[in-house]
A protein has these predicted regions:
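N-terminal loops that bind phosphate or other acidic moieties
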Residues: 1-141
Length: 141
């Protein structure tokens, strides 16, 4: 994989400062399509879950095209692909799940949804201290 990427970069000479040029010269339709999904999430204010190495690459492309796309991207898990850690670090995202997975087929995203459901339930349904009559903290003297 590494040699194929090095060869593609050498032959096609993408401009690293131009995400569209990189995508056109060394990307694939899968990466372009997923980058479009991440951009669409930003346009319509809908969060999109990033899962696995290829979607990390797609998210990186989307963020280079439109930096505010970052605000709508959730990182499901850290892929075992060594470059996945670098991409997450580069885009400033922390994955929610750290389970050493490399299963494919969107497994990390599928594992994330029950966690998101739980977080939403806590956020919307949890009682406040006032609701359950917990007194305000007072320092002991």
């Amino acid at each position: 994989k590494i040699n194929a990427i090095k060869k593609a970069i050498t032959l096609n000479k993408p401009d690293p400062e131009d995400a569209i040029d990189v995508l056109a010269k060394v990307g694939g339709l899968d990466i372009a399509g997923m980058a479009g999904v991440f951009l669409g999430g930003a346009v319509y204010g809908i969060p999109v879950v990033m899962d696995g190495f290829i979607s990390c690459v797609s998210a990186l492309i989307a963020m280079r095209i439109c930096p505010t796309a970052r605000d709508y991207i959730l990182a499901s898990h850290v892929s075992k692909e060594p470059a996945a850690h670098l991409i997450l670090e580069n885009i400033g995202k922390e994955a929610i799940i750290h389970a050493d997975m490399c299963l494919g087929e969107g497994t990390g995203a599928v594992a994330l949804f029950p966690i998101l459901d739980l977080a939403a339930a806590v956020y919307h349904s949890m009682s406040t201290f006032d609701d359950i009559h917990v007194e305000q903290y007072e320092e002991l003297k």
